[in-house]
């Protein structure tokens, strides 16, 4: 799972968000809790970079429900709520 997260980060940096999402999906089944947290956060980032704010918002809400102690994710969730409500 760690390797897939690394690949996903490279894909995000290179602007290949679909490949990043594919690598995240491949990494999730074998991920430890910490790896899953990283993969799922990067999934939010990838959807946001694709300008798919609705999906990013859904993923961010699920993430915050699973990892409520993650303050960065809470800020991301608040940001995404502003992006989706203004598109509405």
Spans of model-derived segments:
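Start-of-helix register in tetratricopeptide repeats
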Residues: 2, 35-38, 72
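Register position in tetratricopeptide repeats
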Residues: 13, 49, 66, 82-87
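Short coil turns that delineate tetratricopeptide repeat
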Residues: 32-34, 68
């Amino acid at each position: 799972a760690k390797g897939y997260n690394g690949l996903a980060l490279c894909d995000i940096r290179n602007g290949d968000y679909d490949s990043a999402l594919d690598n995240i999906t491949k990494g999730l089944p074998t991920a430890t809790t910490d790896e899953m947290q990283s993969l799922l956060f990067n999934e939010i980032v990838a959807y946001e970079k694709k300008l798919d704010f609705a999906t990013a918002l859904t993923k961010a809400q699920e993430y915050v429900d699973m990892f409520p102690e993650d303050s960065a994710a809470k800020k991301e969730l608040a940001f995404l709520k502003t992006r989706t409500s203004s598109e509405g």
